């Protein structure tokens, strides 16, 4: 060991010392090629869309998103509410309208049919409006629904159930002719007890479905507003 200026020490050359100038450049080239192949393989294996999702979510969730187990799927799943909403939208509502149609043909009374089809068309129109808003906003990298759009869709989603429940209640419980059908089963009215009770059950099911769909839209947003003390447009 020999001491040089500024207090630094250097090891003297011996028989085991390899001068830096004598190192073959081939090893450096090999290491560079190996690193390049590793990076190429990594770029092929990594799903960059998932990487972007992780980076985006990390801005909201912090480092937790990078410590999620591999078995945990961060992508959206079909929840029970989504399944029930699909059934009520494409199965239950049309089925109730078919019952109203059967009652209109059998009892010569098309009031339930007109009411059911009108509210159903209104519901589908509201749903299409919501989908249009979401598509237009997401296309421009905005939140799915703005505050005004939330209020508008929420009001329309509640308007349908209110109208249906109010009118159907009056037709079932305050209409004298319909009450006679229920109590007397008058054969002159070209109907029977089975059809009467079937349309009553359909009206009840339609009312519950309409109210549930409206609550399904409003409740998460009201809950978020109560918890975060702010209106979150989603």
Curated annotation (Swiss-Prot):
Transmembrane stretches, start-end: 82-102, 112-132, 153-173, 191-211
Keywords tagged on the record: Host cell membrane, Host endosome, Host Golgi apparatus, Host membrane, Host nucleus, Membrane, Transmembrane, Transmembrane helix, Virion
Keyword Ligase recorded: no
Record GO cellular component, one term: membrane
Chief localization: virion
Pfam families: Herpes_UL20
Localization per Swiss-Prot or TrEMBL: Virion; Host cell membrane; Host endosome membrane; Host Golgi apparatus membrane
GO biological process: viral life cycle
Coiled-coil regions listed: none
Membrane topology: Multi-pass membrane protein
Assembly with partners or alone: Interacts with gK (via N-terminus); this interaction plays a role in the coordinate transport of UL20 and gK to the trans-Golgi network (TGN), and is required for their cell surface expression. Interacts with gB.
Role played: Plays an essential role in egress of virus particles from the nucleus, cytoplasmic envelopment and virus-induced cell fusion. Forms a functional protein complex with gK and this interaction is absolutely essential for their coordinate intracellular transport, gK glycosylation, expression on host cell surface, and function. Together, they modulate gB-mediated virus-induced cell fusion and virion egress and therefore actively participate in these processes.
Family: Belongs to the alphaherpesvirinae UL20 family.
Protein name per Swiss-Prot or TrEMBL: Protein UL20 homolog
Lineage: Viruses, Duplodnaviria, Heunggongvirae, Peploviricota, Herviviricetes
